[in-house]
Structure formats: structure tokens, C-alpha cells
């Protein structure tokens, strides 16, 4: 069942539409089995061996699909035959070769205060987290990361049963609570005392509510940082830092995406810049990356292409899922990742991961 609801920021209006549909699992599975490799081929040079290995594998499978009588027993037998052919003749023989690794971390960025009221923020986080929990029931490999204890506090106050389910997923290791700060705070204007208290209250909440000692400062949507931050982080028991936007300079681009950031007192924290982006089109500037990524082949390829420290590491990161106003990953994201995890010819392979695992591996590589 699908519920579509739209409200306009410019006028008092609301539109609601409901649809009830039946998902054909067999056909849906074949759709993704064919679509994701085909999208991967579109990212490759048509003269490359990888391009033709993908197309040959798809052609063999498609030729087995009997379209003369859709949804008949013969049709479903042919669908299964096509999927078996793909697994045995393409995935097992042409995929999974030695390739870079892209960690895929489920994530939804929620601005606590931006283009909506705090009351709407409370609703956004409940809807987003509920979607995560329902998808976890359908996809046992799914892992999700979310920062900002303020959001968890909203859920605890307004949806205690939802909060109880989150606690259970945290215990199972499928829901990652990280980020260190109470909010993903601005780091230009606040005083040092303010930043210290962001971390104090953030880490205390995570420890008391989830039994988690946060070690990563997670600020994907913040626009600048105090040079005193490494010292503050180190003294707070935080030794890793992830961010995005400071790498967006058009002319004076920082030549590093993974490095040790040394503060004014000599304190150091391992720092990682997100490199998630689609492959740029011809003539398109390679400036922006995203923290609201997808697992599409174009983004898997573009994320690896953008990463600058290939001489040290063969791993990088996509945080996938709708964000800013919440929304989180979708079923489409997870189905797509299951196919990019094959290690499609010419592309990096992917795996569902956590922020902690990625940061630890990246730091170890350096």
C-alpha cells in the first residue's frame, strides 16, 4: 500500500492519494537483476571489456524470458530460468573480481531547525525512523546510522513504542548511534564552551540510553570548523571526524579526502570527507558531493572516482538515503545495493556497512 501526501509551502492546500498494489516478487527480482547491471554498463566505455561482459551476461538471461503469455506458469518458469542464468553465468563468472570497496551506510540527515517548525521536525523523525524499522524487517542485511540525540529524545517523548524498537535494533548491532554532539552543530560561531557542552550532553545521552561511547564527530551538513576542534575532540574522547561541505571549493580544492587534522595545540583527529556523487557528465564541474546518496551504479562509480587517496586506500563511503527533511533509505536503495554488491565488471563492489567500520578501516589504511 502506498500513501502519497503533499502540502504546499505557498498556499493552504493538501493533496492525498492512496494506492493498493500487489508486488510480484519474481518479476521484481528479475527487474533489479537486469536493471542494475544495465545501469552499470551505461557508466562504462563502450569499447571496454567490462561493458561487453555485462551486455553478454544480460543478453543470455533475457533470451530465456518467455513473453508470449505473461504471468502464466510458463512465464514464471522462464523468469526463474533467467535469474538462475544470471547467477551462474554472469555473477559467478564475471563479477566479484578484485575491485575497490564502497561502504554503503544507511542514513537520513534531519535538520532540526530549517524550513519547518520544530513540531514538524518531531513528525519527520518519527516517520523516518519508522520506515527504517519496517525495512529492517524485510532486509536482514540492512544497517542504519543516525546522529543527534535531540532527535532520539523527540521519539522517546512522542512515540515510546517506536523508541523501544530502536533500542532493540541498537542491541542487535543493526542501528548505529554515533555523532558525539547533541546536535550537528555549527562550528564557526559557537564558543569553545558551547562545543564542549554539545559533546558532553551528546555523549552522555548515547551512553545512558544506548550504552554507546561515541568516537566519531559526524557533521555532514556543516559549513566550517574552528581550528580548536581537534583539541576539544581529543579531550572529549572523540578521535574521528566525518564531514562533507568543506571539500566543495570550486577553485582552492583541498587535495585530501582522508587525513590527520592537526589543531592549533598539536592534537590530531582522523578526518574523512564524503566523496559520494554521480559520475560527472562531460563538461560538468566536479565540485559537489552528497550525504544523501544512492546505491546506483553511477554513484558507486562516481564516489570512487572522486576519492583522492587511492594510493593509500581502496575503500570509500556512500551514505545513502533521503535527507535534510528526513526520509531515509528506500526499498529501491536496498534492492540496488544487493546487485552492486556483486562487484559488477568495471565498478567498485559495495557492502552494507557502518560508519564506525568504515572510519576504522580508512584510518588503518593511512
Question: Which residues fall in each region the model found?
Answer:
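Catalytic-domain carbohydrate-binding cleft regions of carbohydrate-active enzymes
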Residues: 1-366
Amino acid at each position: 500500500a502506498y500513501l502519497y501526501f503533499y502540502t504546499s509551502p505557498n498556499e493552504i492546500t493538501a493533496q492525498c492519494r492512496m494506492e493498493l498494489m500487489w508486488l510480484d516478487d519474481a518479476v521484481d527480482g528479475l527487474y533489479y537483476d537486469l536493471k542494475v547491471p544495465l545501469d552499470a554498463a551505461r557508466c562504462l566505455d563502450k569499447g571496454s571489456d567490462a561493458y561487453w561482459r555485462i551486455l553478454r551476461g544480460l543478453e543470455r538471461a533475457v533470451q530465456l524470458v518467455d513473453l508470449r503469455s505473461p504471468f502464466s506458469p510458463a512465464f514464471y518458469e522462464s523468469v526463474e530460468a533467467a535469474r538462475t542464468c544470471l547467477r551462474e553465468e554472469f555473477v559467478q563468472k564475471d563479477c566479484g573480481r578484485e575491485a575497490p570497496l564502497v561502504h554503503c551506510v544507511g542514513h537520513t540527515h534531519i535538520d532540526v531547525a530549517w524550513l519547518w517548525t520544530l513540531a514538524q521536525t518531531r513528525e519527520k523523525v518519527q516517520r523516518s525512523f519508522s520506515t527504517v524499522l519496517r525495512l529492517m524487517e524485510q532486509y536482514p542485511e540492512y544497517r542504519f546510522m543516525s546522529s543527534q540525540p535531540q532527535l532520539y529524545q523527540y521519539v522517546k517523548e512522542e512515540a515510546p513504542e517506536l523508541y523501544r524498537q530502536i533500542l532493540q535494533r541498537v542491541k542487535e548491532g543493526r542501528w548505529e548511534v554515533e555523532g558525539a554532539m547533541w546536535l550537528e552543530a555549527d562550528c564557526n560561531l559557537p564558543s569553545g564552551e558551547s562545543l564542549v557542552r554539545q559533546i558532553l550532553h551528546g555523549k552522555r545521552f548515547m551512553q545512558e540510553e544506548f550504552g554507546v561511547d561515541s568516537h566519531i564527530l559526524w557533521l555532514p551538513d556543516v559549513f566550517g570548523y574552528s581550528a580548536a576542534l581537534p583539541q576539544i575532540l581529543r579531550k572529549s574522547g572523540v578521535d574521528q571526524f566525518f564531514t562533507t561541505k568543506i571539500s566543495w571549493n570550486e577553485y582552492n580544492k583541498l587535495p585530501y579526502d582522508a587525513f590527520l587534522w592537526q589543531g592549533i595545540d598539536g592534537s590530531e583527529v582522523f578526518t574523512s570527507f564524503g566523496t559520494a556523487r554521480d559520475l560527472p557528465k562531460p563538461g560538468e564541474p566536479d565540485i559537489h558531493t552528497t550525504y544523501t546518496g544512492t546505491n546506483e551504479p553511477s554513484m558507486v562509480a562516481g564516489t570512487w572516482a572522486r576519492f583522492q587517496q587511492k594510493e593509500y586506500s581502496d575503500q570509500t563511503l556512500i551514505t545513502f538515503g533521503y535527507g535534510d527533511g528526513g526520509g531515509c533509505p528506500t526499498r529501491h536503495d536496498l534492492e540496488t545495493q544487493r546487485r552492486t554488491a556483486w562487484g559488477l565488471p568495471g565498478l567498485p563492489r559495495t557492502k552494507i556497512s557502518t560508519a564506525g567500520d568504515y572510519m576504522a578501516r580508512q584510518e588503518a589504511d593511512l
